[in-house]
Swiss-Prot record:
It is found in: Cytoplasm. S-adenosyl-L-methionine binds at residues 35, 37, 62, 83, 108, 133. This is Ribosomal RNA small subunit methyltransferase A. The keyword S-adenosyl-L-methionine applies. SMART domains: rADc (SM00650). GO terms for cellular component: cytosol. Specifically dimethylates two adjacent adenosines (A1518 and A1519) in the loop of a conserved hairpin near the 3'-end of 16S rRNA in the 30S particle. May play a critical role in biogenesis of 30S subunits. Belongs to the class I-like SAM-binding methyltransferase superfamily. rRNA adenine N(6)-methyltransferase family. RsmA subfamily. The gene is rsmA. It comes from the Bacteria. Keywords: Cytoplasm, Methyltransferase, RNA-binding, rRNA processing, S-adenosyl-L-methionine, Transferase. InterPro entries: KsgA/Erm, rRNA_Ade_diMease-like_C, rRNA_Ade_Mease_Trfase_CS, rRNA_Ade_methylase_Trfase_N, rRNA_adenine_dimethylase, SAM-dependent_MTases_sf. It comes from Streptococcus pyogenes serotype M12 (strain MGAS2096).
Length: 298
């Protein structure tokens, strides 16, 4: 039986967090990027943003001592929380002892066999959402690992460094726009839901965070001939942001007369000026460019 605890002190209440850490003699490891949230209003806002209810399973990454997990467990059908730090497993067993709908998996999410793990949900056919406070140092690898997996996650509501959230959700012709924006938005819509100040964490990080909501598209935003080549072209177009598209392309593909002739032909086919910068191209433009370059033999 799940015990609802809305009327009690929360794990995220500062006094409770401190008591839990003291009781277990826990010390933070910088290598794991550990910053524990101590604001219950923000935690409730995260759950509301993710629209968690009893018809949804949740995957959480980096539960810490269970502050967000507690809120998720009260609302979701089931929560599967991946925690890489062995020391936190007994703490989570303590703080979440009143919930029978939480599974703590002591494993690196990047190494987990997610296809097998999600079958461990009591009702694996329910939609799955990812809700997490992601470690700053490994945010992008985790996101891309999950997005590119064959698991149909319905949406992601994740906390990350504000700068990274801005880059992911950025539009063309902005300073934040780049290959990361394209890589995520190809698969998902992305929007910053709200900002989280650094002052509500223990220990406090050096920068503010943001909650990013990403919803999986039914189909990728565009259709391309070769996805790997499309992502490769988008990445190389931002290697030197101040350089023109032509300079970035020739730096990568080469500057022989044959290569330059193919690049000129490909750019003409895509109706893209060589003098433009990558940040001015939409995802659709990059799709046309990649297909055209593929067509001319690059």
């Amino acid at each position: 039986m799940i015990i609802k605890r809305r009327e009690y002190m929360r794990i995220a209440d500062y006094s409770v967090t401190k008591a839990v850490l003291d009781r277990h003699g826990f010390t933070f490891k910088k290598s794991f990027g550990q910053n524990f949230l101590t604001d219950t209003n923000i935690l409730q806002k995260i759950v509301d943003t993710a629209e968690i209810d009893q018809n949804v399973n949740v995957i959480e990454i980096g539960p810490g001592i269970g502050a967000l997990t507690e809120f998720l467990a009260e609302n979701a059908a089931e929560v599967m929380a991946f925690e890489i730090d062995d020391r936190l497993v007994p703490i989570l067993a303590d703080t979440l002892r009143d919930f029978d709908n939480v599974q703590v998996v002591n494993q690196d999410i990047l190494k987990a066999d997610l296809q097998t793990q999600i079958k461990q949900f009591k009702n694996p056919d329910l939609p799955i959402k990812v809700v997490a406070n992601l470690p700053y140092y490994i945010t992008t690898p985790i996101l891309m690992h999950l997005i590119e997996s064959k698991i149909p996650f319905q949406e992601f509501v994740v906390m990350m460094q504000r700068e990274v959230a801005d880059r992911i959700s950025a539009e063309p012709n902005t300073k934040a726009y780049g290959s990361l924006s394209i890589a995520v938005q190809y698969y998902m819509t992305a929007k910053v839901a709200f900002i989280v100040p650094r002052t509500v964490f223990v220990p406090a990080p050096n920068v503010d965070s943001a909650i990013l909501k990403m919803v999986r598209r039914d189909q990728p935003l565009i259709e391309v001939k070769d996805e790997d080549f499309f992502f490769r072209v988008s990445r190389l177009s931002f290697v030197h942001r101040r350089k023109t598209l032509w300079n970035n392309l020739t730096s990568h593909f080469g500057k022989s007369e044959d290569i330059k002739a193919k690049l000129e032909k490909g750019l003409a086919l895509a109706d893209i000026k060589p003098s433009i910068r990558g940040e001015a191209l939409s995802i659709q433009d990059f799709g046309k460019l990649a297909d055209a370059l593929k067509e001319v033999g690059l």
